[in-house]
Protein backbone atom coordinates (compact mmCIF):
# COMPACT_ATOMS: atom_id res chain seq x y z
CA UNK A 1 0.00 0.00 0.00
CA UNK A 2 2.78 2.37 0.76
CA UNK A 3 6.01 3.52 -0.82
CA UNK A 4 9.36 4.08 0.86
CA UNK A 5 9.64 7.41 2.67
CA UNK A 6 13.32 7.86 1.94
CA UNK A 7 14.14 6.42 -1.46
CA UNK A 8 10.98 6.80 -3.50
CA UNK A 9 11.30 7.99 -7.09
CA UNK A 10 9.09 10.52 -8.79
CA UNK A 11 7.02 8.49 -11.21
CA UNK A 12 6.75 4.79 -10.46
CA UNK A 13 5.58 5.22 -6.85
CA UNK A 14 2.87 7.56 -8.06
CA UNK A 15 1.96 5.15 -10.86
CA UNK A 16 1.70 2.28 -8.39
CA UNK A 17 -0.44 4.42 -6.08
CA UNK A 18 -3.35 3.18 -8.15
CA UNK A 19 -3.09 -0.05 -6.19
CA UNK A 20 -3.77 1.45 -2.76
CA UNK A 21 -6.08 -1.15 -1.39
CA UNK A 22 -3.78 -3.35 0.68
CA UNK A 23 -0.30 -3.56 2.09
CA UNK A 24 2.42 -3.96 -0.52
CA UNK A 25 0.87 -2.16 -3.42
CA UNK A 26 3.98 -0.22 -4.30
CA UNK A 27 6.37 -1.64 -1.71
CA UNK A 28 8.90 1.12 -2.13
CA UNK A 29 9.58 0.48 -5.83
CA UNK A 30 11.79 3.09 -7.44
CA UNK A 31 11.78 4.47 -10.95
CA UNK A 32 11.18 7.53 -13.08
CA UNK A 33 9.91 8.13 -16.58
CA UNK A 34 12.95 6.66 -18.34
CA UNK A 35 12.83 2.88 -18.37
CA UNK A 36 9.08 2.90 -17.58
CA UNK A 37 6.83 1.42 -20.20
CA UNK A 38 3.11 1.04 -19.58
CA UNK A 39 0.90 -1.05 -21.79
CA UNK A 40 -2.67 -0.19 -22.74
CA UNK A 41 -4.19 -1.27 -19.42
CA UNK A 42 -1.23 -0.27 -17.29
CA UNK A 43 -0.51 -3.81 -16.17
CA UNK A 44 2.98 -4.50 -17.56
CA UNK A 45 5.78 -2.25 -16.34
CA UNK A 46 9.35 -2.49 -17.59
CA UNK A 47 11.39 -1.62 -14.56
CA UNK A 48 14.73 -2.86 -15.72
CA UNK A 49 16.14 0.60 -14.96
CA UNK A 50 15.27 1.99 -11.56
CA UNK A 51 16.47 5.55 -12.00
CA UNK A 52 16.50 8.43 -9.60
CA UNK A 53 15.37 11.92 -10.53
CA UNK A 54 18.83 12.84 -11.83
CA UNK A 55 19.06 9.70 -13.96
CA UNK A 56 21.22 7.67 -11.57
CA UNK A 57 20.43 4.06 -10.82
CA UNK A 58 18.87 3.55 -7.40
CA UNK A 59 18.70 -0.03 -6.10
CA UNK A 60 15.47 -1.42 -4.74
CA UNK A 61 15.19 -1.00 -0.97
CA UNK A 62 13.93 -4.16 0.76
CA UNK A 63 10.90 -3.82 2.99
CA UNK A 64 12.76 -4.67 6.19
CA UNK A 65 15.31 -1.91 5.53
CA UNK A 66 12.72 0.87 5.58
CA UNK A 67 11.97 2.64 8.90
CA UNK A 68 8.32 3.22 8.04
CA UNK A 69 7.80 -0.53 7.91
CA UNK A 70 8.26 -0.75 11.67
CA UNK A 71 6.48 2.52 12.46
CA UNK A 72 3.34 1.61 10.54
CA UNK A 73 3.35 -1.96 11.86
CA UNK A 74 3.43 -0.73 15.46
CA UNK A 75 0.68 1.79 14.67
CA UNK A 76 -1.52 -0.89 13.11
CA UNK A 77 -1.00 -3.12 16.14
CA UNK A 78 -2.14 -0.33 18.48
CA UNK A 79 -5.14 0.38 16.24
CA UNK A 80 -6.09 -3.29 16.40
CA UNK A 81 -5.85 -3.51 20.21
CA UNK A 82 -7.65 -0.25 20.96
CA UNK A 83 -10.28 -0.87 18.29
CA UNK A 84 -11.15 -4.38 19.45
CA UNK A 85 -11.34 -3.37 23.12
CA UNK A 86 -13.25 -0.14 22.53
CA UNK A 87 -15.76 -1.29 19.93
CA UNK A 88 -16.16 -4.67 21.60
CA UNK A 89 -17.04 -2.93 24.85
CA UNK A 90 -19.62 -0.81 23.04
CA UNK A 91 -21.32 -3.94 21.71
CA UNK A 92 -21.29 -5.58 25.16
CA UNK A 93 -22.77 -2.48 26.80
CA UNK A 94 -25.59 -2.33 24.27
CA UNK A 95 -26.63 -5.97 24.63
CA UNK A 96 -26.13 -6.35 28.39
CA UNK A 97 -27.88 -3.14 29.51
CA UNK A 98 -31.49 -2.76 28.41
CA UNK A 99 -31.58 0.92 29.36
CA UNK A 100 -28.95 1.63 26.68
CA UNK A 101 -31.06 0.24 23.84
CA UNK A 102 -32.51 3.47 22.50
CA UNK A 103 -32.53 5.14 19.11
CA UNK A 104 -29.18 7.02 19.15
CA UNK A 105 -27.37 4.07 20.71
CA UNK A 106 -28.71 1.74 18.01
CA UNK A 107 -26.87 3.82 15.43
CA UNK A 108 -23.77 3.85 17.62
CA UNK A 109 -23.94 0.05 17.77
CA UNK A 110 -24.00 -0.02 13.96
CA UNK A 111 -20.88 2.17 13.90
CA UNK A 112 -19.12 -0.16 16.33
CA UNK A 113 -19.95 -3.24 14.25
CA UNK A 114 -18.65 -1.58 11.08
CA UNK A 115 -15.43 -0.61 12.84
CA UNK A 116 -14.99 -4.13 14.20
CA UNK A 117 -15.39 -5.49 10.68
CA UNK A 118 -12.50 -3.50 9.26
CA UNK A 119 -10.35 -3.96 12.38
CA UNK A 120 -10.71 -7.74 12.52
CA UNK A 121 -10.26 -8.31 8.77
CA UNK A 122 -8.47 -5.43 7.05
CA UNK A 123 -6.02 -4.26 9.72
CA UNK A 124 -4.39 -7.68 10.27
CA UNK A 125 -4.10 -8.19 6.51
CA UNK A 126 -2.55 -4.76 6.01
CA UNK A 127 -0.13 -5.37 8.89
CA UNK A 128 1.09 -8.66 7.45
CA UNK A 129 1.35 -7.35 3.90
CA UNK A 130 3.32 -4.31 5.01
CA UNK A 131 6.13 -6.55 6.22
CA UNK A 132 6.22 -8.63 3.02
CA UNK A 133 7.90 -7.91 -0.29
CA UNK A 134 4.88 -9.13 -2.24
CA UNK A 135 1.19 -9.87 -1.73
CA UNK A 136 1.22 -13.07 0.37
CA UNK A 137 -2.44 -14.09 0.06
CA UNK A 138 -4.74 -15.39 -2.65
CA UNK A 139 -6.96 -13.34 -4.94
CA UNK A 140 -10.04 -13.92 -2.78
CA UNK A 141 -8.38 -12.31 0.22
CA UNK A 142 -7.57 -9.29 -1.92
CA UNK A 143 -11.22 -8.92 -2.88
CA UNK A 144 -12.55 -9.58 0.61
CA UNK A 145 -10.20 -7.05 2.18
CA UNK A 146 -11.16 -4.31 -0.28
CA UNK A 147 -14.84 -5.20 0.01
CA UNK A 148 -14.95 -5.05 3.81
CA UNK A 149 -13.04 -1.78 3.82
CA UNK A 150 -15.63 -0.16 1.53
CA UNK A 151 -18.50 -1.58 3.61
CA UNK A 152 -17.05 -0.13 6.79
CA UNK A 153 -16.59 3.31 5.26
CA UNK A 154 -20.11 3.31 3.83
CA UNK A 155 -21.79 2.17 7.04
CA UNK A 156 -19.85 4.73 9.08
CA UNK A 157 -20.64 7.77 6.97
CA UNK A 158 -24.27 6.85 6.27
CA UNK A 159 -24.90 6.08 9.95
CA UNK A 160 -23.44 9.42 10.98
CA UNK A 161 -25.75 11.13 8.50
CA UNK A 162 -28.79 9.25 9.85
CA UNK A 163 -27.79 10.01 13.43
CA UNK A 164 -27.45 13.71 12.61
CA UNK A 165 -30.89 13.66 11.00
CA UNK A 166 -32.39 12.01 14.07
CA UNK A 167 -30.85 14.66 16.32
CA UNK A 168 -32.22 17.40 14.07
CA UNK A 169 -35.76 16.01 14.29
CA UNK A 170 -35.52 15.61 18.06
CA UNK A 171 -34.41 19.22 18.58
CA UNK A 172 -36.64 20.92 16.00
CA UNK A 173 -39.79 19.02 16.99
CA UNK A 174 -39.40 17.70 20.56
CA UNK A 175 -43.13 16.86 20.84
CA UNK A 176 -43.19 14.69 17.73
CA UNK A 177 -44.16 11.06 18.00
CA UNK A 178 -41.09 9.22 19.17
CA UNK A 179 -39.36 7.23 16.47
CA UNK A 180 -39.96 3.56 17.09
CA UNK A 181 -37.10 1.19 17.66
CA UNK A 182 -38.15 -1.13 14.79
CA UNK A 183 -37.93 1.81 12.40
CA UNK A 184 -34.45 2.60 13.69
CA UNK A 185 -33.35 -1.01 13.24
CA UNK A 186 -34.83 -0.99 9.73
CA UNK A 187 -32.88 2.17 8.89
CA UNK A 188 -29.65 0.65 10.19
CA UNK A 189 -30.23 -2.53 8.15
CA UNK A 190 -30.90 -0.50 5.00
CA UNK A 191 -27.66 1.40 5.58
CA UNK A 192 -25.75 -1.88 5.65
CA UNK A 193 -27.48 -3.08 2.48
CA UNK A 194 -26.61 0.18 0.70
CA UNK A 195 -22.99 -0.04 1.84
CA UNK A 196 -22.77 -3.64 0.61
CA UNK A 197 -24.15 -2.70 -2.81
CA UNK A 198 -21.71 0.21 -3.15
CA UNK A 199 -18.85 -2.10 -2.18
CA UNK A 200 -19.63 -4.73 -4.84
CA UNK A 201 -17.24 -3.22 -7.45
CA UNK A 202 -14.36 -4.09 -5.12
CA UNK A 203 -15.41 -7.75 -5.23
CA UNK A 204 -15.80 -7.73 -9.01
CA UNK A 205 -12.71 -5.79 -10.08
CA UNK A 206 -10.05 -6.11 -7.35
CA UNK A 207 -7.24 -8.32 -8.55
CA UNK A 208 -3.58 -9.18 -8.06
CA UNK A 209 -1.19 -7.51 -10.48
CA UNK A 210 2.46 -8.38 -11.10
CA UNK A 211 5.26 -5.85 -11.53
CA UNK A 212 8.88 -6.76 -12.39
CA UNK A 213 11.50 -4.81 -10.47
CA UNK A 214 15.29 -4.52 -10.69
CA UNK A 215 17.20 -5.28 -7.50
CA UNK A 216 20.87 -5.38 -6.54
CA UNK A 217 20.83 -9.17 -6.85
CA UNK A 218 18.80 -9.33 -10.06
CA UNK A 219 15.25 -9.03 -11.31
CA UNK A 220 12.23 -10.03 -9.24
CA UNK A 221 8.46 -9.85 -9.58
CA UNK A 222 6.27 -8.17 -6.99
CA UNK A 223 2.55 -8.88 -6.75
CA UNK A 224 0.17 -6.23 -5.45
CA UNK A 225 -3.55 -6.11 -4.70
CA UNK A 226 -5.21 -3.44 -6.82
CA UNK A 227 -8.87 -2.33 -6.61
CA UNK A 228 -8.66 -0.60 -10.02
CA UNK A 229 -8.69 -2.42 -13.34
CA UNK A 230 -7.47 0.53 -15.46
CA UNK A 231 -6.68 4.26 -15.13
CA UNK A 232 -10.07 5.49 -16.37
CA UNK A 233 -11.91 3.21 -13.99
CA UNK A 234 -9.62 4.43 -11.21
CA UNK A 235 -10.60 8.06 -11.89
CA UNK A 236 -14.29 7.18 -11.86
CA UNK A 237 -14.06 5.27 -8.59
CA UNK A 238 -11.90 7.85 -6.82
CA UNK A 239 -14.26 10.68 -7.77
CA UNK A 240 -17.34 8.62 -6.90
CA UNK A 241 -16.04 7.62 -3.47
CA UNK A 242 -14.99 11.17 -2.65
CA UNK A 243 -18.49 12.38 -3.53
CA UNK A 244 -20.60 9.60 -1.97
CA UNK A 245 -18.44 8.79 1.05
CA UNK A 246 -17.16 12.27 1.89
CA UNK A 247 -18.38 15.48 0.23
CA UNK A 248 -22.11 14.75 0.01
CA UNK A 249 -22.51 13.44 3.60
CA UNK A 250 -20.39 16.31 4.92
CA UNK A 251 -22.68 18.81 3.18
CA UNK A 252 -25.85 17.18 4.53
CA UNK A 253 -24.54 16.92 8.08
CA UNK A 254 -23.26 20.49 7.99
CA UNK A 255 -26.64 21.79 6.81
CA UNK A 256 -28.46 19.86 9.55
CA UNK A 257 -26.27 21.28 12.30
CA UNK A 258 -26.55 24.81 10.97
CA UNK A 259 -30.35 24.51 11.09
CA UNK A 260 -30.14 22.99 14.58
CA UNK A 261 -28.01 25.89 15.81
CA UNK A 262 -30.46 28.43 14.39
CA UNK A 263 -33.40 26.63 15.99
CA UNK A 264 -31.76 26.53 19.41
CA UNK A 265 -30.80 30.19 19.14
CA UNK A 266 -34.36 31.19 18.25
CA UNK A 267 -35.77 29.10 21.10
CA UNK A 268 -33.49 30.82 23.59
CA UNK A 269 -34.48 34.28 22.32
CA UNK A 270 -38.23 33.56 22.37
CA UNK A 271 -38.19 32.09 25.89
CA UNK A 272 -39.64 34.27 28.70
CA UNK A 273 -37.16 35.66 31.17
CA UNK A 274 -38.22 33.56 34.16
CA UNK A 275 -38.21 30.37 32.11
CA UNK A 276 -35.02 31.22 30.27
CA UNK A 277 -32.81 31.01 33.35
CA UNK A 278 -34.24 27.64 34.33
CA UNK A 279 -34.66 25.89 31.00
CA UNK A 280 -31.60 27.12 29.12
CA UNK A 281 -29.34 25.83 31.89
CA UNK A 282 -30.82 22.34 32.19
CA UNK A 283 -32.92 21.03 29.33
CA UNK A 284 -31.25 22.96 26.51
CA UNK A 285 -27.90 21.81 27.86
CA UNK A 286 -29.05 18.20 27.62
CA UNK A 287 -29.96 18.55 23.95
CA UNK A 288 -26.74 20.36 23.13
CA UNK A 289 -24.62 17.70 24.83
CA UNK A 290 -26.20 14.95 22.78
CA UNK A 291 -25.56 16.95 19.62
CA UNK A 292 -21.97 17.40 20.79
CA UNK A 293 -21.56 13.63 20.93
CA UNK A 294 -22.68 13.31 17.31
CA UNK A 295 -20.43 16.19 16.26
CA UNK A 296 -17.46 14.43 17.86
CA UNK A 297 -18.05 11.34 15.72
CA UNK A 298 -18.50 13.42 12.56
CA UNK A 299 -15.36 15.50 13.14
CA UNK A 300 -13.29 12.38 13.82
CA UNK A 301 -14.50 10.70 10.63
CA UNK A 302 -13.89 13.62 8.30
CA UNK A 303 -10.48 14.46 9.77
CA UNK A 304 -9.34 10.85 9.44
CA UNK A 305 -10.37 10.56 5.79
CA UNK A 306 -9.33 14.05 4.68
CA UNK A 307 -5.67 13.18 3.82
CA UNK A 308 -6.75 10.02 1.97
CA UNK A 309 -9.19 11.81 -0.33
CA UNK A 310 -6.86 14.76 -0.89
CA UNK A 311 -4.07 12.52 -2.13
CA UNK A 312 -6.32 10.30 -4.26
CA UNK A 313 -7.97 13.25 -6.00
CA UNK A 314 -4.64 15.02 -6.52
CA UNK A 315 -2.90 12.02 -7.98
CA UNK A 316 -5.64 10.84 -10.32
CA UNK A 317 -6.77 14.25 -11.61
CA UNK A 318 -3.80 16.63 -11.37
CA UNK A 319 -2.15 16.70 -14.84
CA UNK A 320 1.46 16.71 -13.61
CA UNK A 321 0.97 14.54 -10.52
CA UNK A 322 3.55 11.99 -11.64
CA UNK A 323 6.22 14.63 -12.21
CA UNK A 324 5.36 16.50 -8.98
CA UNK A 325 5.25 13.44 -6.76
CA UNK A 326 7.81 13.96 -3.99
CA UNK A 327 8.42 13.09 -0.36
CA UNK A 328 5.65 15.42 0.85
CA UNK A 329 3.00 13.66 -1.20
CA UNK A 330 4.39 10.29 -0.27
CA UNK A 331 4.18 11.10 3.44
CA UNK A 332 0.66 12.47 2.98
CA UNK A 333 -0.28 9.26 1.22
CA UNK A 334 1.00 7.08 4.05
CA UNK A 335 -0.66 9.31 6.65
CA UNK A 336 -3.92 9.12 4.72
CA UNK A 337 -4.03 5.35 4.70
CA UNK A 338 -3.03 5.13 8.37
CA UNK A 339 -5.67 7.62 9.53
CA UNK A 340 -8.35 5.85 7.50
CA UNK A 341 -7.72 2.77 9.65
CA UNK A 342 -7.30 4.94 12.74
CA UNK A 343 -10.90 6.12 12.36
CA UNK A 344 -12.09 2.62 13.26
CA UNK A 345 -10.65 2.80 16.77
CA UNK A 346 -11.11 6.45 17.81
CA UNK A 347 -14.93 6.47 18.03
CA UNK A 348 -14.94 4.64 21.39
CA UNK A 349 -12.21 6.99 22.62
CA UNK A 350 -14.27 10.03 21.62
CA UNK A 351 -17.35 8.53 23.27
CA UNK A 352 -15.36 7.85 26.43
CA UNK A 353 -14.41 11.53 26.61
CA UNK A 354 -17.93 12.96 26.17
CA UNK A 355 -20.13 10.35 27.86
CA UNK A 356 -20.18 9.75 31.59
CA UNK A 357 -22.33 6.64 31.22
CA UNK A 358 -20.01 4.94 28.73
CA UNK A 359 -17.02 5.97 30.82
CA UNK A 360 -18.64 4.28 33.82
CA UNK A 361 -19.36 1.06 31.93
CA UNK A 362 -15.96 1.08 30.23
CA UNK A 363 -14.17 1.33 33.58
CA UNK A 364 -16.30 -1.47 34.98
CA UNK A 365 -15.63 -3.90 32.14
CA UNK A 366 -12.03 -3.19 31.20
CA UNK A 367 -10.34 -1.41 34.06
CA UNK A 368 -11.79 -3.49 36.94
CA UNK A 369 -12.78 -0.29 38.73
CA UNK A 370 -15.73 -0.64 41.09
CA UNK A 371 -17.99 2.21 40.02
CA UNK A 372 -21.01 2.93 42.16
CA UNK A 373 -24.23 3.78 40.43
CA UNK A 374 -24.98 7.39 41.17
CA UNK A 375 -28.47 8.67 40.29
CA UNK A 376 -27.26 12.17 39.56
CA UNK A 377 -24.76 10.78 37.04
CA UNK A 378 -27.54 8.94 35.21
CA UNK A 379 -29.73 12.05 35.28
CA UNK A 380 -27.23 14.51 33.89
CA UNK A 381 -24.20 12.91 32.29
CA UNK A 382 -26.21 10.43 30.24
CA UNK A 383 -27.25 13.22 27.94
CA UNK A 384 -23.64 13.81 26.96
CA UNK A 385 -22.93 10.57 25.20
CA UNK A 386 -24.34 7.06 25.20
CA UNK A 387 -27.75 7.77 26.69
CA UNK A 388 -30.24 5.69 28.59
CA UNK A 389 -33.90 5.72 27.60
CA UNK A 390 -34.95 8.18 30.31
CA UNK A 391 -32.48 10.80 29.09
CA UNK A 392 -33.74 10.57 25.52
CA UNK A 393 -37.32 11.17 26.69
CA UNK A 394 -36.16 14.17 28.71
CA UNK A 395 -34.41 15.79 25.74
CA UNK A 396 -37.34 15.44 23.39
CA UNK A 397 -39.92 16.92 25.76
CA UNK A 398 -37.74 19.47 27.48
CA UNK A 399 -39.29 22.48 25.73
CA UNK A 400 -42.85 21.59 26.76
CA UNK A 401 -41.97 20.46 30.26
CA UNK A 402 -39.79 23.45 31.06
CA UNK A 403 -42.43 25.96 29.96
CA UNK A 404 -45.17 24.23 31.94
CA UNK A 405 -43.01 24.13 35.06
CA UNK A 406 -42.56 27.90 34.98
CA UNK A 407 -46.29 28.53 34.60
CA UNK A 408 -47.07 25.99 37.31
CA UNK A 409 -44.67 27.64 39.73
CA UNK A 410 -46.38 31.00 39.26
CA UNK A 411 -49.84 29.44 39.57
CA UNK A 412 -49.01 27.65 42.79
CA UNK A 413 -47.41 30.78 44.20
CA UNK A 414 -50.55 32.81 43.50
CA UNK A 415 -52.83 30.16 44.95
CA UNK A 416 -50.79 29.91 48.14
CA UNK A 417 -51.56 33.57 48.90
CA UNK A 418 -55.28 32.79 49.20
CA UNK A 419 -54.88 30.87 52.46
CA UNK A 420 -55.89 33.76 54.75
CA UNK A 421 -58.99 32.36 56.47
CA UNK A 422 -60.67 29.02 56.81
CA UNK A 423 -62.75 29.24 53.64
CA UNK A 424 -60.04 30.97 51.67
CA UNK A 425 -57.50 28.36 52.77
CA UNK A 426 -59.66 25.58 51.49
CA UNK A 427 -60.06 27.19 48.10
CA UNK A 428 -56.36 27.93 47.80
CA UNK A 429 -55.30 24.43 48.70
CA UNK A 430 -57.88 22.84 46.44
CA UNK A 431 -57.02 24.91 43.38
CA UNK A 432 -53.32 24.36 43.82
CA UNK A 433 -53.70 20.63 44.17
CA UNK A 434 -56.10 20.44 41.26
CA UNK A 435 -53.56 22.03 38.93
CA UNK A 436 -50.91 19.60 40.12
CA UNK A 437 -53.12 16.60 39.52
CA UNK A 438 -54.21 17.84 36.08
CA UNK A 439 -50.67 18.35 34.85
CA UNK A 440 -49.64 14.98 36.22
CA UNK A 441 -52.30 13.22 34.18
CA UNK A 442 -51.35 15.07 30.99
CA UNK A 443 -47.61 14.42 30.98
CA UNK A 444 -47.50 11.18 32.97
CA UNK A 445 -44.97 12.40 35.50
CA UNK A 446 -44.28 9.94 38.35
CA UNK A 447 -46.00 11.96 41.08
CA UNK A 448 -48.62 10.92 43.62
CA UNK A 449 -52.18 12.01 42.86
CA UNK A 450 -53.48 11.07 46.29
CA UNK A 451 -51.20 13.41 48.20
CA UNK A 452 -52.00 16.37 45.98
CA UNK A 453 -55.76 15.97 46.24
CA UNK A 454 -55.48 15.12 49.91
CA UNK A 455 -53.74 18.43 50.51
CA UNK A 456 -56.60 20.28 48.89
CA UNK A 457 -59.19 18.49 50.95
CA UNK A 458 -57.31 19.09 54.15
CA UNK A 459 -56.94 22.75 53.34
CA UNK A 460 -60.69 23.14 52.86
CA UNK A 461 -61.64 21.66 56.23
CA UNK A 462 -58.81 22.48 58.57
CA UNK A 463 -59.66 26.08 59.40
CA UNK A 464 -57.66 29.31 59.49
CA UNK A 465 -54.54 29.32 57.31
CA UNK A 466 -54.56 25.59 56.58
CA UNK A 467 -55.18 26.01 52.87
CA UNK A 468 -52.31 28.45 52.45
CA UNK A 469 -49.86 26.23 54.30
CA UNK A 470 -50.98 23.17 52.34
CA UNK A 471 -50.63 24.96 49.01
CA UNK A 472 -47.17 26.23 49.94
CA UNK A 473 -45.99 22.78 50.98
CA UNK A 474 -47.55 21.28 47.86
CA UNK A 475 -45.79 23.85 45.69
CA UNK A 476 -42.37 23.26 47.21
CA UNK A 477 -42.52 19.47 47.21
CA UNK A 478 -44.01 19.28 43.73
CA UNK A 479 -41.54 21.68 42.12
CA UNK A 480 -38.61 19.84 43.70
CA UNK A 481 -39.89 16.46 42.57
CA UNK A 482 -40.88 17.85 39.18
CA UNK A 483 -37.54 19.48 38.39
CA UNK A 484 -35.63 16.37 39.45
CA UNK A 485 -38.00 14.22 37.42
CA UNK A 486 -37.47 16.20 34.22
CA UNK A 487 -34.01 14.75 33.67
CA UNK A 488 -35.23 11.24 34.45
CA UNK A 489 -38.28 11.32 32.19
Swiss-Prot record:
Subcellular location: Cell membrane
Extracellular topological segments: 1-74, 129-143, 206-235, 315-333
Cited Pfam families: 7tm_1
Transmembrane segments: 75-95, 108-128, 144-164, 185-205, 236-256, 294-314, 334-354
Superkingdom of source: Eukaryota
Segments of this protein annotated with the region Disordered: 438-468
Keywords: Cell membrane, Disulfide bond, G-protein coupled receptor, Glycoprotein, Membrane, Receptor, Transducer, Transmembrane, Transmembrane helix
InterPro entries, A to Z: Bombsn_rcpt-like (IPR001556), GPCR_Rhodpsn (IPR000276), GPCR_Rhodpsn_7TM (IPR017452)
Membrane topology: Multi-pass membrane protein
UniProt keyword annotation of Protein biosynthesis present: no
Glycosylation, residue list: 25, 50, 219
Tissue specificity: Highly expressed in larval brain. Also highly expressed in adult brain with very low levels in larval and adult gut.
One GO molecular-function entry: neuropeptide receptor activity
Disulfide bond positions: 142-225
Keyword Nuclease among UniProt keywords: no
Gene Ontology CC annotations of this record: membrane; plasma membrane
GO biological process terms on file: G protein-coupled receptor signaling pathway; neuropeptide signaling pathway
Compositionally biased spans, kind Gly residues: 452-468
Topological domains annotated Cytoplasmic: 96-107, 165-184, 257-293, 355-489
Effect of deleting the gene: Reduced levels of insulin-like peptide Ilp5 mRNA, reduced secretion of Ilp2 and Ilp5 proteins in mid-L3 larvae, growth defects and developmental delay during larval stages.
Function: Receptor for the neuropeptide CCHamide-2.
PANTHER family reported in the protein's UniProt record: LEUCOKININ RECEPTOR-RELATED, NEUROPEPTIDE CCHAMIDE-2 RECEPTOR
Family: Belongs to the G-protein coupled receptor 1 family.
Name of the protein described by the UniProt record: Neuropeptide CCHamide-2 receptor
Organism: Drosophila melanogaster
Gene for this chain: CCHa2-R
